[in-house]
Each structure stands twice: as C-alpha cells, then as structure tokens.
Amino acid sequence: MSGNTFGNLFAVTNFGESHGPAIGCVIDGCPPGMALSEADIQGDLDRRRPGTSRHVTQRNEPDAVEILSGVYEGKTTGTPICLLIKNTDQRSKDYGNILDTFRPGHADYTYLHKYGLRDPRGGGRSSARLTAPMVAAGAVAKKWLFEKYGTTFRGCMAQIGEAMIPFESWEHVANNPFFAPVADVSNLENYMDALRKAGDSCGARIRVVASGVPVGLGEPLFDKLDADIAFAMMGINAVKGVEIGAGFASVTQRGTTHGDSLSPEGFMSNNAGGVLGGISTGQDLEVSIAIKPTSSIITPRQSIDTAGNPAEVVTKGRHDPCVGIRATPIAEAMLALVVMEHALRQRAQCGDVKVSTPDIMRSRG
C-alpha cells in the first residue's frame, strides 16, 4: 500500500489499523533543538479521542502517546520522531456480521477490489482512528510554528446536520462537546439525541483558522498553499468538500466585492482566505470542510455480499452519529502540517530574500 506519507520536508508516515495492537506515525524533518515531550502532544489527542461524551463513539481509548525516538534529554534531535498510540478497547466481534457483506458508504467494496482482501474490524486501515497519529504529528508542527512565527491554529463546528451554528466566541469552543463557538448547545444536544434515537447520522461543516502565518508560503504552480490545504483536508476521513476563504460563495460575488483591497493598515477583507496566487498573504488562513454523515448506522440498508447476492446490512458496534464532532482537532492538525511543510520550504529556498515593501499584516501589530 502506498500513500501513507504526507509531506516532503516535514514528512509524516502513518501506520497501524483500527483494531491492531497500536497506531502511530514517524515524523521525518522536524528541526533539532525544540523542547518536546508527550505532554506537548497529549492535549490535542485528548480533544480528538473517543468516548468523551454521549454524542460520539463510546469506544474508550485513552490515546496516550509515547515518543519512541527523535528526542534526547527533552529536545528534538533532528532524527525521525516515532509516536506510538496503543489500541486498548478493540471489540472486533461487533463486525462478525459483515465479514462477507459490503457496508454502504464504507470502503469495504473498494478495498476488496483493490487489494483482494480487507480487514473488516473497524474498517482496518480505512478507519478514522488513523487520524489520531496525524493529530499527534500536527501538535509537533503547531509547537514549532508557534515558537518560530507565533502561528496559532483554531477550529470550530459551523454546522451540524441542518443546524447552523452562529459564531459567538472562540472561548466557547472548549466548553462543549461539539466544538461549537456558542454558549448554549442545548439545541445541538437535542438534535443529536433525536438522531441517535432514529438510528441515523448526519454530516457537519468545520471551520479552521491559522493566524500569524508568514507572508510568502506556497510554491506555484502545482504546490500552491491552498492546493496543498485542499489536498490535506480531502485526506481526512469522510470529507467531501473544501472551501478556502469565500469558497463557493465566490460564484455570486462580483469583482468589486471579492477582491481584497489593500491599505497601509492591512487588507480590508479576506475573501481570498489568506492566499493569493497560491502564496500566503499573512492574513488568517480560512478553511472550511464538509463532512458526510456517518456511514455506520443501525438502520437496515440494502447491499450485496462478496458473491454478488443481495444482502441487508445492519451495522453494529460503537460509532459516531456525527464524525464531524471530533473532526475539529483533526482539521487543525492537517492545516498545521501543510503550513509546517511550506515554512520549511520557504526557509530552505527563499530564506535570504529581502523586499523593501512592508509586510502590512505584520506592521499592524
């Protein structure tokens, strides 16, 4: 199987399966000399981990990360960093009824046709559990970027199913299980309770923002910053759409509205989402992703078995009624990995470039 490594200068190789003994990643390219411990990583893993509320899967994984290499006396050495997360709460018997049938919306059918066999236990390699190592790697990237440039990453739930979530404050995001930027989430709790009772699932829209991004990141033509962001976000399980800045709303905007005017104090809007010509402007990187409804639901659905005969599928097990609820730290991590990759490229290729035009975003403050 190819396609397990993300990035080049900051390369993250992901390994493991949902019900295997462990999952993890190896990071190649982290600069030496940065203080790093498990505690620097665990916080983001705790935000993503399952079993934290009744609105997500009840699989109870502590997701405790171990640093196996690449750190000596508390500092990164510049050598590969191996991060390990042990699986402790697998329940493979839940998947006994789908050994010979294909679950609608899952990768069962495509994996079998591609590889000639498949691991049905929790989806195996196609499971969203494999996002945990990427969150761990993203935490390493976040730390380096913050210490080097002051770059920060934040995300929130903007919509869950039909329920639009107005933005009130970033301060609310950590105070509820939905990562919602609102003080009162009772309507979201009622919505999810009704959905679970109906044996159904829903999708979500996640917003993620990177602030303090240096000007000049991105490599036209084919490694544009926004192109790599879209590539990274589409690599997250269940993501079916990506918007940068105004995104699809650009279709109905006019040029007099969409183009972000400049002033000595900075850009006057951010329809571009922080990227022009594939290169960062220094404004916030604004990204939204659309996540499809969870495919594993208890409502019976029609499918076929491995012999091609009609079959009815009822998915048992412990599943998220909305996988988007835990996607916020995942999207933050993937955005951080993209910015980290391009920051290292910029340092290597254009680190000596000097311009007389002021950085208007930095000069603001």
Swiss-Prot record:
Keywords: Amino-acid biosynthesis, Aromatic amino acid biosynthesis, FAD, Flavoprotein, FMN, Lyase, NADP. NADP(+) binds at R48, R54. It is an enzyme of class 4 (lyase). It catalyses: 5-O-(1-carboxyvinyl)-3-phosphoshikimate = chorismate + phosphate. FMN binds at R125, S126, S127, N237, A238, G277, K292, P293, T294, S295, S296, R318. The keyword 4Fe-4S does not apply. One of its GO terms (cellular component) is cytosol. The keyword Flavoprotein applies. Its cofactor is FMNH2. It holds the Pfam family Chorismate_synt. One of its GO terms (biological process) is chorismate biosynthetic process. CDD domains: Chorismate_synthase. Pathway: Metabolic intermediate biosynthesis; chorismate biosynthesis; chorismate from D-erythrose 4-phosphate and phosphoenolpyruvate: step 7/7. It comes from the Bacteria. Reduced FMN (FMNH(2)). GO terms for molecular function: chorismate synthase activity; FMN binding. Its EC number is 4.2.3.5. Homotetramer. This reaction introduces a second double bond into the aromatic ring system. PANTHER family: CHORISMATE SYNTHASE (PTHR21085:SF0). Belongs to the chorismate synthase family. This is Chorismate synthase. It comes from Polaromonas naphthalenivorans (strain CJ2). The lineage of its organism: Bacteria, Pseudomonadati, Pseudomonadota, Betaproteobacteria, Burkholderiales. The gene is aroC.
